[in-house]
């Protein structure tokens, strides 16, 4: 969708901003109704919303500035960030399965990004955005382990509201890389597509991502989330002309295998 919106004139990530605003408009009546009933509306979760929404926005914008495979792999280095955050903030000690996950993830990252140098680093602004997005989103996931909410609605509404604010600020701050704000005509011409993907894709997937850990367990969800790497790598090789070779295949496979091992080898009490 990002590439389609960009081709339709919504450059600079403004397509994502439009989707976020549509989500806010659709969910606002429910938020108001919940507030009148004395229930949580989601507005009282700014920190959580900024972390989850901001991480996702960085991820979405990175696709406009780097290759699909690079964005996927850098964003899904989240096991590294969650391990660091769990040690620092939750005082958890990582087990053997987590260490194996980290080694495989780092190994996969090295294989993909070590074409030019032995010590690879992100090469462009899109790479850095994807890496930062993974770290921010991981912080949001850690936050979800700590807070208690009245169902999934407060989370999804805070994601859209505070994610929109983050997206607008990021759009202006990164205008040198993403380009200026599009014309009104561009928004009008893409309005039907924006509404369609917001209602049938953006909002439902957001609900599933934020709701599923409490229903399916973190282990199964981690495998499902990592499966996006497989889908993304495969689709990018079919739909785009971006680099796709043995490095991308092996590197992404190592990250996915690491996620599976983390679940299979985890102690039963977890």
Label for each model-derived stretch:
Residues 1, 46-61, 65, 111, ...:
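Hydrophobic alpha-helical transmembrane segments of multi-pass membrane transport proteins
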Residues 3-4, 27, 82-83, 119-178:
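Transmembrane alpha-helical segments that form core, pore/gating elements
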Residues 4-5, 15, 62-63, 71-74, ...:
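Hydrophobic/aromatic residues within transmembrane alpha-helices
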Residues 9-13, 38-41, 114-136, 176-197, ...:
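Juxtamembrane helix-entry segments on the extracytoplasmic side of multipass membrane proteins
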Residues 18, 72-77, 144-163, 202-238:
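Helix-helix packing/entry segments at the starts of transmembrane helices
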Residues 20, 226-270:
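C-terminal-most transmembrane helix of multi-pass membrane proteins
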Residues 26, 31-34, 78-103, 230-249:
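C-terminal transmembrane-helix exit sites in multi-pass transporters
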Residues 27, 97-115, 247-266:
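Hydrophobic transmembrane alpha-helices of multi-pass small-molecule transport proteins
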């Amino acid at each position: 969708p990002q590439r389609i919106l960009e081709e339709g004139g919504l450059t600079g990530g403004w397509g994502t901003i439009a989707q976020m605003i549509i989500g806010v408009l659709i969910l606002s009546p429910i938020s108001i109704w919940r507030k009148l009933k004395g229930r949580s509306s989601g507005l009282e979760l700014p920190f959580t919303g900024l972390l989850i929404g901001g991480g996702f926005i960085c991820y979405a914008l990175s696709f406009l500035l780097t290759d699909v495979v690079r964005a996927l792999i850098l964003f899904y280095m989240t096991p590294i960030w969650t391990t660091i955050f769990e040690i620092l903030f939750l005082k958890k000690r990582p087990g053997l399965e987590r260490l194996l996950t980290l080694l495989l993830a780092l190994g996969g990252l090295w294989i993909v990004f070590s074409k030019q140098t032995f010590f690879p680093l992100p090469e462009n602004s899109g790479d850095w955005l994807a890496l930062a997005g993974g770290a921010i989103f991981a912080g949001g996931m850690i936050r979800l382990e700590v807070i208690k909410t009245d169902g999934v609605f407060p989370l999804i509404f805070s994601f859209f509201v505070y994610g929109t604010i983050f997206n607008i600020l990021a759009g202006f701050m990164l205008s040198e890389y993403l380009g200026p704000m599009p014309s009104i005509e561009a928004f009008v011409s893409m309005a039907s597509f924006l509404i369609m993907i917001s209602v049938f894709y953006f909002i439902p997937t957001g609900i599933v991502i934020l709701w599923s850990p409490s229903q399916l367990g973190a282990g199964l969800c981690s495998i499902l989330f990592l499966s996006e790497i497989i889908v993304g790598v495969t689709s990018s090789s079919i739909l785009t002309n971006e680099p796709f070779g043995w490095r991308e295949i092996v590197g992404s496979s190592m990250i996915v295998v690491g996620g599976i091992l983390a679940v299979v080898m985890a102690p039963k009490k977890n």
